[in-house]
Swiss-Prot record:
UniProt KW keywords: DNA damage, DNA repair, DNA replication, Ligase, Magnesium, Manganese, Metal-binding, NAD, Zinc
Pfam families (UniProt xref): BRCT (PF00533), DNA_ligase_aden (PF01653), DNA_ligase_OB (PF03120), DNA_ligase_ZBD (PF03119), HHH_2 (PF12826), HHH_5 (PF14520), Nlig-Ia (PF22745)
Any one GO molecular function term: DNA binding
Domain BRCT as annotated: residue spans: 591-669
InterPro entries linked to this entry: BRCT_dom, BRCT_dom_sf, DisA/LigA_HHH, DNA_ligase, DNA_ligase_AS, DNA_ligase_CS, DNAligase_adenylation, DNAligase_N
Function description: DNA ligase that catalyzes the formation of phosphodiester linkages between 5'-phosphoryl and 3'-hydroxyl groups in double-stranded DNA using NAD as a coenzyme and as the energy source for the reaction. It is essential for DNA replication and repair of damaged DNA.
GO BP field: DNA repair; DNA replication
Name used for this protein in its record: DNA ligase
Family per record: Belongs to the NAD-dependent DNA ligase family. LigA subfamily.
Active site per UniProt: 116
Broadest EC class assigned to this enzyme: ligase
Catalytic activity: NAD(+) + (deoxyribonucleotide)n-3'-hydroxyl + 5'-phospho-(deoxyribonucleotide)m = (deoxyribonucleotide)n+m + AMP + beta-nicotinamide D-nucleotide
GO cellular component, one term: cytosol
Length: 669
């Protein structure tokens, strides 16, 4: 076959396969058999392999999955992906309607209602009609680049029907039938199953190997247009129509409503129809349809005033409580958990539910053998709502919390003003394991690839008992563990080695000193600069630091007044773990050349590691100016957790937005 004929045939096959994909995954109306589709795909793959010069990034063949990735790169969203306020009942919906009408002084409001897909929110970027990048929502400001995995989802067009530049947003999800099939395969292979379709979708999207994502049969509904060049669309409903014309899959069950009564009827209708869908929904999204009215209403500190998410009531089911098991946390708190006869709740099989503490068991008179009502709080965490007393036979057993720790048999205590029972034995194995999980977590030592499962493996193999033991681990030890190969073992050893260079505040937070969170750890690290200086500090010296109270000061002094802790710190030194503050102190910032010099910065939301007042001082010390509102003269918005209206203003004025992690990176350069 000549090059010219091969090129022509490749183009024909691409057009044909794109049409087949659109008919099957968007229109849900396939025109060919699976066998015919596969024959055409195999022919295309063969021709592209023989003629690599004709390969294209938007070829249907890329949907089978490409090169394995080492890591997901971070992506800053051009406009923040905001969350919505919630409504839980008819009264909340009527309050929303009243606020909308008061806000625009106009009785002629039209709403658009859409099913709230329970999946993973993603953004899709197209340049001149070609799909160039996809990202997760992340924290709303920064997500992860998952382009290669999204290319495997056949409901996402790789090339649009127009050469338009835009950003679309939607929800990637796993159909129920695909979820059932996937879990059956995992059970057959002896692997852990996914709890629900949402977790399965999220886990599939974040696979480093796109070929795995390609096998998971994910789909996607696009629900919004974030940015589009050279085009003004007057309503949300028209933007969805436009997205459909471009080749996107939009949910066909949306409806425009002229009154709040029609909205409520739509909500009630889909609450009944919900179980019959082949995908999970957890509510209804209601938006003011007119874009001009949306802009007029604006946003609050947390969410748009023109939209709300109605959350379906948590599904409640009855099952039998067969036992109560106990778990011990890293601080020694002993938490009771109900063991249940397996029951399906909100799409997943539930075998356990939280009982919180002994007082709740007494208050609800929960006994072993009782029939109980179980629901998922927010459709996520199972909990026991109440006992069905009419079903009691008299054979149920009252439960009494133990007097000794289930993990180490030390006597349990109840501290003053606490409802929880605690184990105060510092050598309790359950506390040590949970403490190790905290030590390696993201805000602490941030050791990549070392989570709860691996910590448990290492602990059960008796490889680790203290934080310092992590730094003596070898590749040979890791290779003895299940699911570890040469590459993963090498990567983990290197990640542990890299963590030795962390600044002091991460180590302090990782130690899990009672009352000392990430922010306080940073305050101590900056003030004392070295671990040795902090260890020697008196309670009075600690209390003299701004925002450090008596309880925290006493806790820190008591922690370091312990021979085992001092021995641990000595081991850290021997392994080469850094125990000095690597950040910049405010007093040292005056002569530093900085990005912030001459910049106007707005801080919004909750900053976890560094409080806003401290961040303000540092920016100002570096020559920047911190203001309380976003305008055209703003250079940067730093957004923490639960940031709201200022993000929308940043989008309006095209101002750059950073999350806290990016801010700290720049600050510590």
């Amino acid at each position: 076959m000549s090059k010219e004929i091969a090129k022509k045939r490749i183009e024909e096959l691409r057009d044909l396969l794109n049409t087949f994909n659109y008919q099957y995954h968007v229109l849900d109306n396939p025109s060919v058999s699976d066998a015919e589709y596969d024959r055409n795909m195999q022919e295309l793959i063969k021709l592209e392999a023989e003629n690599p010069e004709f390969m294209s990034e938007d070829s249907p063949s890329v949907r089978v999955g490409g090169t394995v990735l080492d890591i997901f790169e971070k992506v800053t969203h051009k406009s923040p992906m905001l969350s919505l306020g919630n409504a839980f009942n008819e009264g909340d919906l009527r309050d929303f309607d009243r606020r909308v009408r008061q806000g625009i002084d106009d009785a002629n409001v039209r709403y658009i209602c859409e099913l709230k897909i329970d999946g993973l929110a993603v953004s899709l970027h197209y340049e001149k009609g070609r799909f160039i990048q996809g990202a997760t929502r992340g924290d709303g400001v920064t997500g992860e680049d998952i382009t290669q995995n999204l290319k495997t989802i056949k409901a996402i067009p790789l090339r649009l029907n127009e050469e338009v530049t835009l950003e679309a947003r939607g929800e990637a999800y796993m159909p129920k039938r695909s979820f059932v099939k996937l879990n059956e395969e995992k059970e057959q292979n002896g692997e852990d199953v996914f709890a629900n379709p949402r977790n399965a979708a999220a886990g599939s999207i974040r696979q480093l190997d796109p070929k795995i994502a390609a096998k998971r049969n994910l789909s996607m509904f696009v629900y919004g247009l974030a940015n589009v060049e050279e085009k003004t669309i007057p309503s949300h409903s028209e933007s969805l129509d436009f997205l459909g014309e471009l080749g996107f899959k939009t949910n066909p069950n949306r409806r425009t409503c002229e009154t709040i009564e029609e909205v409520i009827a739509y909500v009630e209708e889909w609450q009944e129809k919900r179980p019959h869908l082949d995908y999970e929904i957890d509510g209804i999204v209601i938006k003011v349809d007119d874009v001009a009215l949306q802009e007029s209403l604006g946003t609050t500190a947390k969410s748009p005033r023109w939209a709300i998410a109605y959350k379906f009531p948590a599904e409640e089911v009855v099952t039998r409580l067969t036992g109560i098991e106990l778990s011990v946390g890293r601080t020694g708190v002993v938490t009771p958990t109900a063991e249940l006869e397996p029951v399906r709740v909100a799409g997943t099989i539930v075998r356990r539910a939280s009982l919180h503490n002994e007082d709740l068991i007494r208050e609800k008179d929960i006994r072993i053998g009782d029939y109980v009502v179980v629901k998922k709080a927010g459709d996520i965490i199972p909990e026991v709502v109440n006992v069905i007393f009419d079903k009691r036979t008299g054979e149920e057993e009252e439960y009494h919390m133990p007097t000794h720790c289930p993990a180490c048999e030390s006597e349990l205590v109840r501290l003053e003003e606490e409802v929880a029972l605690r184990c105060i034995n510092p050598t309790c194995p359950a506390q040590i394991r949970e403490g190790l999980i905290h030590f390696v977590s993201r805000n602490a030592m941030n050791i990549d690839g070392l989570g709860e499962r691996v910590i448990t493996q290492l602990f059960d193999a008796d490889y680790i008992r203290t934080f310092a033991d992590l730094y003596s681990l070898t590749k040979e030890q890791l290779l003895q563990l299940e699911r570890f190969g040469e590459k993963s073992a090498t990567n983990l050893v290197q990640a542990i080695e890299n963590s030795k260079e962390n600044s002091l505040e991460r180590l302090l937070f990782g130690l899990g000193i009672r009352h000392v969170g990430a922010k306080a750890a940073r305050t101590f690290a900056e003030h004392f600069e070295t671990m040795d200086a902090l260890v020697k500090a008196t309670e009075e010296e600690l209390k003299a630091i701004n925002e450090i109270g008596e309880k925290m000061a006493q806790s820190v002094v008591a922690y370091f007044d312990n021979e085992d802790v001092l021995e641990l710190l000595q081991q850290f030194k021997e392994y080469g773990v850094n125990m000095t503050y690597k950040g910049i102190k405010i007093a040292d910032l005056q002569n530093v050349e900085s990005y912030f010099a001459g910049k106007t910065v707005v801080l919004t939301g909750k900053l976890e590691v560094m409080g806003r007042s401290e961040a303000k001082k540092k920016i100002e010390a570096l020559g920047g100016k911190v203001t309380g509102s976003v305008s055209k003269s703003t250079d940067l918005v730093v957004a923490g957790e639960a940031a709201g209206s200022k993000l929308a203003q940043a989008e309006k004025h095209n101002v750059e937005v950073w999350n806290e992690e990016r801010f700290l990176q720049e600050l510590n350069k």
